[in-house]
Regions:
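Short, acidic/charged, Gly/Pro-enriched secondary-structure junctions
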Residues: 65-107, 187
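Beta-strand signatures of extracellular beta-sandwich domains
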Residues: 183-187, 243
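Edge beta-strands of jelly-roll/beta-sandwich modules across compartments, strongly enriched
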Residues: 134-137, 232-249
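Extended extracellular/luminal ectodomain segments enriched in beta-structured repeat modules
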Residues: 51-52, 159-167, 179, 223-225
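Solvent-exposed edge beta-strands and adjacent loop segments
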Residues: 1-63, 95-126, 131-161
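Noncatalytic modules at the cell exterior or secretory-pathway interfaces
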Residues: 118-120, 164-170, 220-240
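Exposed aromatic-hydrophobic patches
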Residues: 57, 152-155, 210-219
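Extended, low-complexity, turn-rich repeat/linker tracts enriched in Gly/Pro/Ser/Thr and Asp/Glu
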Residues: 63-66, 172-181, 234-239
């Protein structure tokens, strides 16, 4: 995957939407090529090593609770496996829009600026666990009513055949107090009506703001074509704002 630079994109990091504080994101995925050439071979052969996936983020420094600088420098610096989800084409959510996501660690952070200039920042979120997983943001919004709802079904021809992994990221941006809960499950089925859905990934029940990255590694075949997210909310009063990403790779 070549480096891709996005200058007008939506970005979720952990429990925060950081899009409005950034001016650009450069996303890249590479992998180590480890030589395994045998004695007497006439050609060199290689084996894939660790991934090197990075999102280089830059923008304008903003200090204060819930703002970009303390989020990246204090809250998440050197914290492992915080999901970052990048929507390349728009800062606004569109249902089932294409996105990339991976479990990241903020490995570098610096702020800089000359006298009389706006202070800027640069940060690098990276991982060796996965590539930048291509997928979809199945839902982003606020739920205020108890009950079960579903995202709009998305058709992915061939689904997730055996040997493919399924990935899911949950970003919970706000969560009302009072015992309300959110359960998110990724489902698929052979038919768009979901008469007999299969649960593929069940996220940990959410009771507060936070995030989770979950993987069905070496998944059994989920080759049905239609995919959706099931969302179950309980207890009132309730108001939960969250986003759900899933991808197959």
């Amino acid at each position: 995957m070549a480096t891709q630079v996005f200058s007008n994109c939506g970005t979720y990091f952990g429990q925060y939407v950081i899009s409005t504080d950034m001016s650009a994101v450069a996303l890249s995925t590479a992998a180590d090529a480890l030589e395994k050439t045998a004695m007497g071979a006439t050609v060199r052969t290689f084996k894939k090593g660790l991934y090197d996936t990075k999102a280089n983020v830059e923008g304008y420094y903003s200090a204060g609770t819930g703002l970009i600088s303390p989020i990246l420098d204090e809250t998440y610096f050197a914290i492992k496996d915080v999901p970052i989800t990048i929507i390349p084409l728009t800062t606004q959510y569109v249902e089932n829009c294409g996105a990339y996501s991976f479990p990241a660690t903020i490995a570098t952070w610096n702020s800089f600026g000359g006298v009389g200039e706006m202070m800027k920042f640069r940060a690098t979120a990276e991982t060796t666990a996965t590539p930048a997983i291509p997928g979809y943001v199945a839902y982003y919004g606020t739920k205020t009513a108890v009950g079960t709802t579903y995202s709009t079904a998305l058709q992915i021809t061939g689904g997730a055949p055996a040997g493919k992994n399924i990935y899911c990221a949950l970003h919970v941006f706000s969560h009302s107090a009072g015992g309300d809960t959110l359960d998110v499950t990724l489902q698929n089925d052979a038919l768009v009506g979901f008469g007999d859905p299969t649960d593929c990934i069940a996220m940990t029940q959410s009771v507060a703001v936070g995030y989770e990255w979950k993987t069905d590694v070496g998944a059994a075949a989920h080759a049905e074509d239609f995919w959706r997210v099931k969302m179950v909310l309980s207890a009132e009063p309730i108001s939960i704002t969250f986003a759900v990403f899933f991808g197959i790779y």
